[in-house]
């Protein structure tokens, strides 16, 4: 039988994934001073053991001020890289490619964990810190803390932090690096008209608003191995009433990032305004991803609402995505790849899992036939 598209290998640079199922970064908010814990080790090993081809470690802050919450992981010192190296090795040992996303939360930083309010930490709470952003414009809604407008020195420092974190990720054994340029965090805020009111070379027209992203990419490209994938998650659309304009600008910037050494784009939503009218639904970003793939000329991945096996296979088969990012479905069922393989009729579906699981599942199936 023909192998379903979702279960065909995917090669980018010198890295080959066993299938097109990827686990996107999903913050666990369970770190201590940026350090990973046993929770992270078991969590990521379990996702890899479930059969995904790529497992990307959650948004990992490049500096203490870059954390979303006090529970975020970090790579701003060498000691934090020790725990990350254990995670990378565990993911690899269970058959997946270890990836990591490095990030700065910008004006959305200094927040309580989602289950503790999901709002900014109170000004008089010692757990909080000053936030920075391209401009002194708060996000709004539950995140209304006024950020400090960044100076050139701030920009230079943050970009140096990205470089240092990328080096630590490389040395920790990660084979796939994703830059977080999405979701209303710092880089997205530079690109977005909702977060950037600057009048200098980093603001105004789309080219200027994309400058921080291009400079950060170029700086990281210098230190990240040329044979390993360098990717970015980028909000190419906001659903704010100027969708066509934003998407056209985002595609133009994506072309520039591709020319600057970007290997793949993880297509997402901007989340730069609380007033967005997002059309939530199954694989709702698939047409957007397809357009980015076609017009920007590079491989794409995407997530959001892709939990149905048939839909996941179809977006790959139809050329809308090269990889499918499966998030919440993998949290609910880390063996989602196995159940998907069965539903799609993959021959010997048990063997998408490691042998210690697969032989029992296949043996039981044969005996009960």
Residue ranges and their predicted role:
Residues 1-369:
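Flavin-dependent oxidoreductase catalytic cores
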